[in-house]
From Swiss-Prot:
Name of the molecule in the record: Cytochrome b6-f complex iron-sulfur subunit, chloroplastic
Membrane topology: Single-pass membrane protein
Subunit structure: The 4 large subunits of the cytochrome b6-f complex are cytochrome b6, subunit IV (17 kDa polypeptide, petD), cytochrome f and the Rieske protein, while the 4 small subunits are petG, petL, petM and petN. The complex functions as a dimer.
Alphabetical list of CDD domains matching this protein: Rieske_cytochrome_b6f
Source species of the chain: Volvox carteri (Green alga)
UniProt EC number: 7.1.1.6
Domain Rieske, chain residue ranges per copy: 92-188
Keyword Acyltransferase: no
Cofactor: [2Fe-2S] cluster
Intracellular or extracellular location(s): Plastid, Chloroplast thylakoid membrane
Pfam families: Rieske, TM_PetC
Length: 206
């Protein structure tokens, strides 16, 4: 009888011990689970952070793009006064006094397009101007004096000193415009509709 009573008393103790063991296992598992990062939550946070970070970058890119896209492209009809960065008419003497031989600087040309005025080797204004709009996707192409060429910052197209395309993806040379100095010294642009002297072909912009 004593043995039976002892066994009966021990049974509840074992059951309690088993329950405690299970409870402890659940607690440990919960603790470990809380320490392991939830991949779904991490992915969501990464997307949020990426989206937030992309906003200022996107705005910057848009601002940059807008700077290089001109208001229009191609030539116009009739003569038009060339204008400087402030919108003032350009006079030949004043321009030559501040621009050296070989200089290529932007002015406002036909239809308001950015157009290069060229100073020749003998110190006069060249008889033609170059529309600065890239023939690929319309970026304004800077003149790189150190390399004696125009290089597009958008997709790498290049043009020689006369605006002839020498490297793509631009398919065509820069558009030409006649450039003349009037009797009063005013510099004017007019449409170039003759053969393109650089290629021997009809002007694609006319």
């Amino acid at each position: 009888m004593a043995m039976i009573t002892s066994r009966r008393a021990a049974a509840p103790c074992k059951a309690q011990a088993t329950r405690r063991s299970r409870v402890m296992s659940v607690v440990r598992a919960a603790a470990v689970s809380s320490e392991v990062p939830d991949m779904n939550k991490r992915n969501i946070m990464n997307l949020i952070l990426l989206g937030g970070a992309s906003l200022p970058v996107g705005s910057l890119a848009l601002g940059y793009g807008a700077f290089f896209v001109p208001p229009s492209s191609g030539g116009g009809s009739g003569g038009q006064a060339a204008k400087d960065a402030l919108g003032n008419d350009i006079k030949a003497n004043a321009w030559l006094a501040t621009h050296q031989k070989g200089d290529r600087s932007l002015s406002q040309g036909l239809k308001g397009d950015p157009t290069y005025l060229i100073v020749t080797a003998d110190g006069t204004i060249e008889k033609y101007g170059l529309n600065a709009v890239c023939t690929h996707l319309g970026c304004v192409v800077p003149w790189v004096a150190a390399e004696n060429k125009f290089k597009c910052p958008c997709h790498g197209s290049q043009y020689n000193a006369e605006g002839k395309v020498v490297r793509g993806p631009a398919p065509l040379s820069l558009a030409l415009a006649h450039c003349d100095v009037q009797e009063d010294g005013l510099v004017t642009f007019s449409t170039w509709s003759e053969t393109d002297f650089r290629t021997g072909l009809e002007p694609w912009w006319a």
